[in-house]
Structures are given as C-alpha cells and as structure tokens.
Amino acid sequence: MFLRNRYNYLALVFVSYFIFIIYSIFSLQILNSDETIKRIDQQTLDVFYLTPPRGEIYDTNNEKLATSSLEPHLFINLRKINKDNIDQYKQYLKYNFQELKNSDLEEIFSSKEILYLVRNINDLDYLERQALQELDAFEIFDYPIREYTYMNIASHIIGYIGKPTSEDFEEFPNTIKTGIVGKSGVEKYYENQLSGKAGEVVFKGDEIVDFILPESGEDLYLTIDIETQIVATESLLEGIKLANENFESENIIQKGSVVVIDVDTGEVLTMVSLPDFDPNKFVKGISSFDFNQLNRIEAFNNFAIQGLYPPGSVFKVVAYWLAENEGLFPDGISSRSNRMKCEGNLSFSFIDGSQQVYNDWKEDGHGNVNLSSAIQQSCNVYFWDIALKIWRTYEGNENESILQEYARNLGFGKVTGIDLPFEKSGVVPDRDLFEEWTITRPELVRPEGWLGGDLMNLIVGQGAITTTPMQVASAYKTLLTGYSSAPYLDKNIDSVQKVKNYDINDDFIEFLLSDLNLVTNKDGTAYFAFEVLGRKANDIGGKTGTAQNPGDKNNTSWFAGVDSISNPKYVIVTVVDEGGSGSAVAAPISRRIIQHLIGEDLTPVKFGEITE
C-alpha cells in the first residue's frame, strides 16, 4: 500500500512537470507569436537608401548659388531579374535608352545592389513613364539633381560633388554608397550640414513593403557677394589677357587669384581662382577627357589658399612694422622720418674682404628716402639695409630670426583657418629650416646653410619664402586693425575669435594707412593704375609687388590694398602667376575691383607702368 502511494506521488510530480514544460513552450511559441513573427520578419528585411536633396547654398544677399531639384529617375529592382527575363529587360533598356552602351548594361545587371539607378527620365512624358511601370522590375523614384546657378563663377568656393570613395566613407561615415558627397569647396567642408538624411526603400524578398522619404540637408548662407565675385572674375580675366599681350613668357599666363575680405570681421566677400571649372559637369558624371583637360591646367586648385608664391614687395609691410616697433632702421637712421641716400645698390664686404653688391630694381636709385618713401617707391636698398643691420646685430643668437617671428605673428607660414579644405601653409625660412632641409631636401639649400644673403632676400619677399594670397590678405587685415582672426565663408558662424596684437597700436595703423596711400598717388608705384580715379585715389592705398621666380618663369604680379584710408572696410589682394610687374598688371586689376566696392563706374583694366 505504501509503495503504491509512493508510485502515485511520483507519477503526479512527473505529470505536473510535463504540463509545465508544455505550457512554457506554448507561451513562447503561441502567446508570444506576434513578437516572434515580427522578429523573424525583421531578419528578412533589406533596406535600399535613397539619396537626399542637399541643402541650398546662398550668397550674402540670399542669391541662390547651388540648389537641388527632385526629378524622376528609373530604377530597376534586380531581385526581380532572373534568367528567364534578363534578356527581355536588357533589350528593353537598349531599345528605349539608346545612349546606354553594352558595358552600361553589363554593369547594371551584374550589380549586387537591390535597386540600380538607370537614368533620369525627366524627358519622358506621363504615358511613357506609366508604360515603364507596367514592367514588374521597374520602379520610379525622385532623385535630387544638383544645379550651380552661376556655373564657373565661385566654383572654387562652392566646390563640386561626386560619387563617394573609400576616403569619403572614412571621413563622412553617414554617407550612403549609392549617394553623392562634396569633393571640394564648401560642398566638402560643410558636407555633414548639407547632405541631409537618406530615405529608405524597405524590401521583404523582392517586394517593397515600406518607404521613408529622404530629408533635405540644411541650407548654407555664405559671406560671398556674387556681384563682386563676377566683377573680380572679369577683372582678373582682363588683366591676364593684358599680361599675355605685353609680356614674353615661356608659358601661357592663365593662373591668378583675387581675395577680398572684410577688415573688421574677416568675412570673405570675394575669392577668385583661375583657371576655374563648371561644377555642373560633375552632377551627371564628367568625362575622363574633360576631367584630364581641367586637371592639366590645374583648374581644381584654389590658388587663393593653395597657390604658393614668393610675395615680393607686398611683404615689405612686415619689415615696415618691425622697423617701427623695434626701432631697427638702416645704419645711421634713428627714426621713420630720417632719410638715407639710395644710389641703386647696396655694397658690403664679406669677412674675406670680397664685395657683395645688391642692385635695386631702379638702377639709378631712389635718392633720399625714409620709411614712408621706401614703401611708396618700393626701395629695396632701404629694406636690405635693415636686413644687414639685423644680421650684424643678432647673427647666431635668439634674435637672429626676429623678422621671421614678426612674419609668423601675422600668420605667414601657417594656414589661416578658413572654412575650406586643402589650405596650404607656405614657408617662412630660417636657420633651423635650412638645417632640416640639408638632410631632407638638400637640393633646396647650399651646403653652407643659412646666410645673411638669405635674410636680405627674405626682407623683400624673395628667396625661400612662399605664401598664399589669403595669408597676405589676412596679414594686411591684422596690420590695419591690430586684431587677428580667421577668414570665413559661413555667414552664420557662431562666433569670430579676435586676438588682440599688442604690438600694433593706433599710431602705427595711421602711419601705415598714410604710407599705403602714397603708393597709389603721385610718385607711387601704383600711381598710373589708379590715376583714372582722380581725387578718389586720395582715399585708397596699397602695395605693389613683383616677385622673381626660379628658372625661366616670368615674375609674379602682386597687389595688396585697402578700399579706403579714412574708413577701411575691405582688404583686396590680387596675384597673377607669371603676370610680370605688380604695378602693370595686379594693380590695375585691383583698381577696377575697388571701383566696384566704392560705387564708382567701372573702367577697363589698363596695362600699368612697369615698376619694381
């Protein structure tokens, strides 16, 4: 009896345990079946991402520079293509879209994508589009088309777009592989802002089960004034044409740049680089021939921030500042007003007794000059004498690089920080750099290293120094305000960080403006270029520069100026690579741009007097 009850008890326990197991399984498979099915479904869903429209780009006056329009595009659902219908679809595409080559068809039907974008069908009428949709594998979706309103104008500022590369995916992780990405200019720099959020076409198997619209990118408002940009581009083209007509050069003169920045804020009003390109050519894919042609003439280089040139005499304002601030004037001169005799050359003795002679650009000399007239007439001898004094006073000690420190204080030798990609820093040479180059780039330096002659080259903007037009504009801005700040293009930038330069005071700024004004008036190197302005020239200032290039290359033409002496608003810098004399080419170009800035009627760019 006891044994039988024990067996009954064990049986009851076993049955209870079995019922519990069955209930648990039932709960998982039946009671939670909705969640289970949902989870299984999710595991079989695939997503194709649709490219979103990019944000619009506007100039400072809300003029549209770049826009995106949605146009119907034909896509093919490759999951509905099989061995039974592939030839039918190939023949259909080949017959109806005759621009498609056999290689295009092979690319389409060998793709691993779910959907493949075949072409824009904006040229088809309603009935033709309906006919396409009767074929099961065809889908029609809106796809954004980028359009650049002003074509080549401001192309280096705006940039262009293209298919993403592995480098793009690394830099912008949210980029979709079937999308587009900014390749240069603000299109690249502000990619995350402009790109938007991709749409989604959700597939279960070969059927579309959900669709999420893409979201447009944010709009971008620039500091650029497109009207000034057009005037600056036209003026630079006129000047380059004149340079080709008046100078003999081994190369066709075609490279140049113009920069106009706000003296107070650093806003970039205009930035031109030539040769340029039409970014619209990249929207549907540029041909290899066209790309190679543009690449050959360096049309994709933004010479305003990537062109590295010796600055020539526009660099003399650095020595001007140093002389004023440190009291470092030529031998026997104790102030800015004292004069020295310039006879057209500077001669001095080496330790071994041999003579070195430096010849000024003006063979018969400038006569009696002080700091003001040395800037006005661009007297090399005056500044060479300052370099010689620095060398003899400081050779071998920590102050030997005092000129270089003043240059770096103005931003030479480092990027300005403008909101554009690929900016270059340039070079401010000194003893340490030459020692480094002796090891790394021995072809650039002499075995004896840094010498006094290198300092004399540097003080007049020659030798190993290289700089960009934007650096020169930024340096002049600092000298004219006493504050340094990065130039910028985004009009809605959160804040502009201004750094006070305590070595630049109001008296210095007043002296500099007055002396720059001498350059554009009687006896100044830019007088002929600005003579057409008459009395208006009394309120304009600048500095010409003619920089020698190595080998058989023609000189580089420079002008750096300000639109008003009494109330400076803009700094203007013009460079023409191999353009010759700064007073003959760059100054007349700048004059026409200044005419626009001050509201004067425009007159043609006229070849100026060759000085320097």
Where are these regions (language model features)?
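Beta-lactam-recognizing serine transpeptidase/beta-lactamase-like catalytic domain environment
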Residues: 64-66, 200, 207-211, 224, ...
